[in-house]
């Protein structure tokens, strides 16, 4: 079974559904919630629903 929340590291995110999102160089996560993350470059990453 897939984890119920995202796994976040310095260089990327593994979403609850198993999708790997590589962060661009110099970009970090400034806010993380149960269904999405806001990045320091203004991008918004939405996780797929499980």
Curated annotation (Swiss-Prot):
Organism domain of life: Eukaryota
GO molecular function terms noted in the UniProt entry: structural constituent of cuticle
Tissue specificity field: Calcified shell.
InterPro entries: Cuticle_1
Sequence repeats: 6-23, 30-47
Entry keyword set: Cuticle, Repeat
Stated name of the protein: Cuticle protein CP498
Species of the source: Cancer pagurus
């Amino acid at each position: 079974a897939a984890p119920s929340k995202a796994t976040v590291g310095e260089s990327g995110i593994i979403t609850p559904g198993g999708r790997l999102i590589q962060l661009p160089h110099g970009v970090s996560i400034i806010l993380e919630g149960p269904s999405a993350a806001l990045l320091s470059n203004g991008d918004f990453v939405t996780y797929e629903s499980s």
